[in-house]
């Protein structure tokens, strides 16, 4: 059921069916835990935890600047408060960067790790594109949100699923814009730390959409090769939010990987 952490004010949804380690989903910048609806339905017989990141959805942000330690601490505090010993962690986009940081520091809390739509070693041109996008987004105009949606989904999918377009657009529109910019700035200026990746010892799956222009298949393959023993899966026909558009294939990949890594010690 939806709830808010009494001590840390994080808004979350936690469904506990049994004593198995839960799957925790971390959303991307500008979004909320509501993007995981297809996963909540598919994994309805599993223990599931989703939550709103700092400054997103119903979770407040009381800092003028954000860093990954803040996001890592947020997740650690939440699972401690819920008395969860270990988790299967799935991070998307900015959420995947948070998951990488968490795994490098708190690997003892993880049974498995899934990094979906994760950037890695952006080229100078890719950095320029993201920086230009950040400048446009500062204006908070509807056109910037529309461009995001068309980058995240195929035109065909948006045409056939107007309710999804409206839902995600509203999600972006209802954000506190200043808080959104704090998180987006962190994403825009992100520099990969290979030493941190070397510290990840959790069984890891790296996934991305076949047609994701920001978190490319090349990035995902290279990231999977950098993390010890990591596996790589490309979601056919998917773009950035293929967890929604290609949810069947995405969910099956997650389910198989999680089922191979259950550990309730």
Give the residues covered by each predicted segment.
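Gly/Ala-rich beta-loop-alpha elbow adjacent to hydrolase catalytic centers
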Residues: 91-95, 99
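Catalytic histidine-centered segment of alpha/beta-hydrolase-like enzymes
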Residues: 238-247, 251
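Acidic catalytic loop of the alpha/beta-hydrolase fold
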Residues: 210-215
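Short beta-strand/loop motif that positions the catalytic acidic residue
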Residues: 200, 206-208
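Flexible "cap/lid" loop of the alpha/beta hydrolase fold
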Residues: 100-105, 110-141
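Conserved alpha/beta-hydrolase catalytic His-Asp/Glu region
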Residues: 124-128, 141-198
